[in-house]
Amino acid sequence: MTSMEARLGEATRTVPLPAPWDLNAYLAAVAAHRGRSISLRPVSAAMLAEDGCRGKGLWVARGHDDIIVYDADATDRNAEHIILHEVGHMLLGHGKDLAEPATPLSPKLAALLPSLAAQHVLGRNEFGVEGEQEAEVFADMTMVYATLPRRTARGFRLFRRDR
C-alpha cells in the first residue's frame, strides 16, 4: 500500500460516508470530528481567480470555523466534487498551522464576505502537487463510493487493496 493510499484510507475511516449519501450530513460529521463548523459560500469564478485560485474552490480557515468557497456556476455534481476536494485537504491535514499569519482575501472577495476574519485562505497554490493529488483522489473516490449501494456507513478502500 502506498503512502497516499494509507493517508486516504485513514481519512475516510475517521469520518465514514453516510448511507444513503448526503453531502450536508457528511459535512456535519466532518465538522463534528474536527470541532469546527463548515459553511459553504458560492461566489463567481472571477472572484476565485482573483484570489489566485486556479481551481474552482478555496478553503477559508477562520479561528473557530471553516468556509468552503466554490464556483457559483458549477453544476451540482461539480460543486459537490469541489467541496469534497476541500474537505479532503481538511481531513488529510493539509492546512497551515493556524498560528501562522493570515493570508489576506482579495478586495472583492473580502467585500463580498465582510464578516470573514480569515486565519488562512487555502487555495491550490498552498498545498503543492502531492497535496492537490491527494485531495483530488479523495474527492473522486468519495463521489464513487457515495453512489455505491451498501447497508451501513463506511469509509472507502482505495482500489480494494486492504481487504
Task: Describe each region flagged by the PLM.
Residues 83-84, 97:
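Short, glycine/charged-enriched secondary-structure capping and boundary segments
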Residues 1-36, 96-163:
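Metalloprotease/metallohydrolase-associated module, dominated by Zn2+-dependent proteases
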Residues 75, 79, 83, 127-134:
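Short, well-structured alpha-helical patches and their helix-loop capping segments
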Residues 39-80, 87-93:
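Active-site scaffold of zinc-dependent metalloenzymes
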Residues 32, 52-54, 85, 125:
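Generic detector of intrinsically disordered, low-complexity, polar/charged segments
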